[in-house]
């Protein structure tokens, strides 16, 4: 049941959360190795040092005090890597400032792999986000990274959920109530959707985002729910007329 609970929790975490109100008058522009963030995929190779440049355009009437530049990657509402670089500078009102720094993601290979949503943001002295820009990152990591291991764990839990539900069906041990039988199959469906989302991400086909995650997870969960609902009552037996007769020779 712990595995089923984890799969249900992962599915719930896919629901889009309310966006925090942000001041749109502060704009962040960033580029990595001369390529603008937000144009195409951002390639992150742990074996190479990247040159990051950020430009903060302050259209407000107050000074913006930047302390940290953060680059993070998330999937399924979980953060799998985050790099904070201290680059303190002030951006006067109605002006812009640019800063550059090297990024050495040497341990990135053990944290993530494949396509992931990446956010570049500038943080003030109060640890609040001033502005951010989002893109899709192509992480050249290992299958045995934290993200890869997470996907393998979800795959194992999903297999166990399906095995438990199907074995209970074969042994006529499912609940007599249709809705309870449907709920018995639901975690397996959620897990199937999560496995599909993670697999597409690792194979660098589709990055995990709400528009990609929700259809897969909801669709697979609905299919499993319907399958469980339509399973026969565990107390049902075949009609005598349907039972095969065997002739005993004397």
Regions found by a protein language model. Give the residues of each.
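Alpha-helical transmembrane segments forming the membrane-embedded cores
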Residues: 155-250
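Short glycine/proline/serine/threonine-rich loop/turn segments at secondary-structure transition edges
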Residues: 107-117
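Short beta-strand elements
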Residues: 126-150
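Hydrophobic secretory-pathway targeting helix
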Residues: 1-22, 232
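Short beta-strand and strand-turn-strand segments in soluble, beta-rich domains
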Residues: 32-34, 74-87
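Intrinsically disordered, low-complexity Pro/Gly/Ser/Thr-rich segments with frequent PxxP/GP/PP motifs
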Residues: 80-108
């Amino acid at each position: 049941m712990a595995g089923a609970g984890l799969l249900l929790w992962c599915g719930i975490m896919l629901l889009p959360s309310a966006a925090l109100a942000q001041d749109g008058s502060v704009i962040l522009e960033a580029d990595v190795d001369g390529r603008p963030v937000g144009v195409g995929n951002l390639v992150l190779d742990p074996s190479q040092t990247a040159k990051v440049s950020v430009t903060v355009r302050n259209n407000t009437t107050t000074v913006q005090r930047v302390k940290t530049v953060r680059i993070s990657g998330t999937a399924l509402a979980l953060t799998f890597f985050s790099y904070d670089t201290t680059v303190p500078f002030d951006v006067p009102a109605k002006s812009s400032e640019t800063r550059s720094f090297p990024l050495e993601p040497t341990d990135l290979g053990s944290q993530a792999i494949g396509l992931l949503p990446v956010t570049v943001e500038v943080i003030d002295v109060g640890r609040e986000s001033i502005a951010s820009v989002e893109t899709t990152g192509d992480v050249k990591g290992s299958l045995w990274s934290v993200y890869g291991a997470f996907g393998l764990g979800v795959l194992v839990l999903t297999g166990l959920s399906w095995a438990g539900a199907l074995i209970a069906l074969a042994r006529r041990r499912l609940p007599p109530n249709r809705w309870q039988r449907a709920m018995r199959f639901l975690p397996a469906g959620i897990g199937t959707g999560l496995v599909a989302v993670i697999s597409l991400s690792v194979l660098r086909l589709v990055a995990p985002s709400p528009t990609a995650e929700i259809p897969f997870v909801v669709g697979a969960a609905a299919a499993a729910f319907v399958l469980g609902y339509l399973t026969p009552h565990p107390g049902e037996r075949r009609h005598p007329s349907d039972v095969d007769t065997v002739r005993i020779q004397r």
